Every structure is written in structure tokens, then in C-alpha cells.
Amino acid sequence: MKFYRIYIELTNICGLSCSFCPTKRLPAQTMSVEFFDSIVRQAKAYTTEVACHVVGDPLTLSNLHEYLDILEQHKMKTVLTSSGYYLKKHTYQTLFHPTVKQINISLNSYNKNDTSLTFEQYLEPILRLCDEKIRQENEIFINLRLWNLNEQMSEEAYNEKLFAAFSIHFGILLESDTIMREKPKTIRLDRKILLHFDHYFTWPSLDNPYCGDGRCQGLDSHIAILASGKVVPCCLDSDGVIALGDLRLHSLQEILSTDRTLEMIKGFREKRAVEKLCQHCSYKSRFSD
């Protein structure tokens, strides 16, 4: 069994309250460096890439460099996903750590929060990050996410401000009308700096309408490990509703070999959603064929 990526949640703390994220039901928790090391030692048998995120922001951690050092020691590549609010907490030595292959910045975090920061104050460290990447000729990818193309008037003004700022900074013409009409997946701002577009999605919940069967990438391309050590089948199960096991009690190999895990894998291969949460998840419709 191999995965393209394993999501390991260093912390479930993000410091924000974005309207597009689910209300956190689990207590605030940060995975210790020692526990993280024990998990990575097991995870490297299944993948070569770790995403340090489920719902928390890894950049809230002042000792992020320690976690990245561990990933480098185990020859893993890393993806960091952040709101962008905590970039100033870290040096470029940390942000451009040799283990980091990509940094994702969720640009929707600004307009979906009440904040004292001005738009310019929010964007400035993001643009500086891009400038430093260009200056260093660093091979890292910077992925600027704007996942609101299904929104209409409520997002238009914010998007236009972003497009204007990026147009000036990168010397590229970004026209809101054209983007909304053509709906590109990505626009290249500079070498390995991409503006990535998508739609908001509904997080799975037992309170959601019944969605039926279907395929999923969970337990196929990836699994996720929450800050508590619980293993879940996909990166959207942020509350651990489908806790396949706890790494404080069992090994990853044992957890991935249980009847429950194997039945989920078999079900998805047959386009069946075995677990109740999966039956109430609309995200899997993206993988229907």
C-alpha cells in the first residue's frame, strides 16, 4: 500500500475563523516534535511526501523548523499550507527549507475574516515571499489559492483588488471578467508561482444531506493523521469521525490492515461509500466517472 501523500496535522490551531472552514469540535492540540518523529518514521514506508496540514496552520508554530528538519532527515518532501497571516513569524531559511517543495497560501483567508489588517498589510509578506523565491532562484512552488469562482457579487470586489495588485507586481494583465468567463485552473505569475482557482466546497458532515455512493481519493492517494495521532481516511475528516486507529496505541501498519480500513478501500474501488460520513460527503462527486 502506497500513497502519493500523507497529511500530518502538526497543529489544529489556525488562529482564524474563516467562514468556509467547519467549526472545530476537537480541543486545540499541537503534535509534539517527538511524536511527529515517530509518525514520520512509520509514514515513510508508505509515501515520500507529507503535507503538514488538515485544518490548522503550521506557520503558527514558532518551532516549525524542527518539524521540517525531521522530514529532511527522513528524506521526505513537504507541502506547507497557510492562511498567509503568519509568514512574518518565520525566516526564509525556514520557509524555503530544503524539504519544502510547495507553499500554498489560501488568499480567501483575508476576506472571510474580521481582521484589523489592511489588504495591503496582508498581501505585503506574501508578495515579499514571492520576490525572495525569485531572487534566490529557488525551485520551490508557491501556489496562491483563490477558491471562490462559484461566488458572485460578494467576491467580485475582493478578487478585483487581488488581480490589480498581482497585475502591477508581476507585470501580467489579470482581468476579472475574462477569468470569471474562462475559469482557468491556474495562471502563471512567474516561474513556479501560480494563481490557483477553484470553487468552495462543503466539508463532509453527518448533518449534510445524503449524497449516496461514489469513489474517493481517501485511502487511495492519501490518508490523514490528526494532531491527536488519530488516523483518518481523508484530509477532510478534520474531526476524526472515521478514526481508523490511534498512533499512540497502534502502529500505522496495524491501523491500515484492520477490517474497517480494508472494507473502505474495497468499497471505494466498487464505487460504494461504506462509512456514513462518506455517504454525506458531496466532495466525492468530483471523482465520479
Residue ranges and their predicted role:
Residues 1-103, 114-121:
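Conserved alpha-helical substructure of the radical SAM core
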Residues 61-206, 212:
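Conserved AdoMet/S-adenosylmethionine-binding subsite of the radical SAM
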Residues 135-141, 171-211, 236-286:
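C-terminal accessory region of radical SAM enzymes
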Residues 25, 110-112, 262:
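A short, flexible beta-alpha/helix-coil linker loop
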Residues 219-221:
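Short loop/turn microsegments at loop-to-beta-strand junctions
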Residues 14, 18-21, 216, 234-235, ...:
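Short cysteine clusters
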Residues 225-226:
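Short, acidic, Ser/Thr-enriched surface-loop or helix-capping motifs
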